[in-house]
Amino acid sequence: MTTEAAPNLLVLTRHGESEWNKLNLFTGWKDPALSETGIKEAKLGGERLKSRGYKFDIAFTSALQRAQKTCQIILEEVGEPNLETIKSEKLNERYYGDLQGLNKDDARKKWGAEQVQIWRRSYDIAPPNGESLKDTAERVLPYYKSTIVPHILKGEKVLIAAHGNSLRALIMDLEGLTGDQIVKRELATGVPIVYHLDKDGKYVSKELIDN
């Protein structure tokens, strides 16, 4: 749990699989529900946190139902179904612009596999009318620092249930990674990551809760 060197706790979790993940669609700010698998993933993540004794003082999630439902399921599993939960579009997934709602294979046919891969896995190149990961970070990080960090520094145990790219932005900041490093980081659906932070909210260690 917490130690003298790392008194503060932050848990990040990507939402469970959504119906659109299952269909291989670009989702972005579209709002599909969790799939049956996604509900099970969120429940399992919550069970694993409970088995390790984790509790929270406040939770944050996005304005999208797949993250909100994941957050709710986790809190139910750890025995805190009524915990204060703050929802903000600042934690939304990267906005995929013209790619949203398209099957990834269809997008590759339209623009070419290499171009689609550049949009997906470069730090500062955005798809048409969408956000790059850099743009996403510029939305997520000011909110994290102004709104979430004060709770961490008060010693509150914080849960954030969000999305692959909004969480990549946070992880890049927490771990001091470069843009090139963070675009290679894969985040499994529904698997919590526990960050142990020092008194100033800086990264000390982490634990992947995947078993």
Curated annotation (Swiss-Prot):
Signal peptide: none annotated. The N-terminus is blocked. InterPro entries: His_Pase_superF_clade-1, His_PPase_superfam, PG/BPGM_mutase_AS, Phosphogly_mut1. The record marks H163 as: Transition state stabilizer. The modification Phosphoserine is found at S62, S166. Its EC number is 5.4.2.11. Substrate binds at residues 14-21, 27-28, 66, 93-96, 104, 120-121, 164-165. Keywords: Glycolysis, Isomerase, Phosphoprotein. CDD domains: HP_PGM_like (cd07067). The modification Phosphotyrosine is found at Y96. Pathway: Carbohydrate degradation; glycolysis; pyruvate from D-glyceraldehyde 3-phosphate: step 3/5. GO terms for molecular function: phosphoglycerate mutase activity. The active site is at H15 (tele-phosphohistidine intermediate), E93 (proton donor/acceptor). The keyword Iron does not apply. It is an enzyme of class 5 (isomerase). NCBIfam families: pgm_1, PRK01295.1. PANTHER family: PHOSPHOGLYCERATE MUTASE. This is Phosphoglycerate mutase. The lineage of its organism: Eukaryota, Fungi, Dikarya, Ascomycota, Taphrinomycotina.
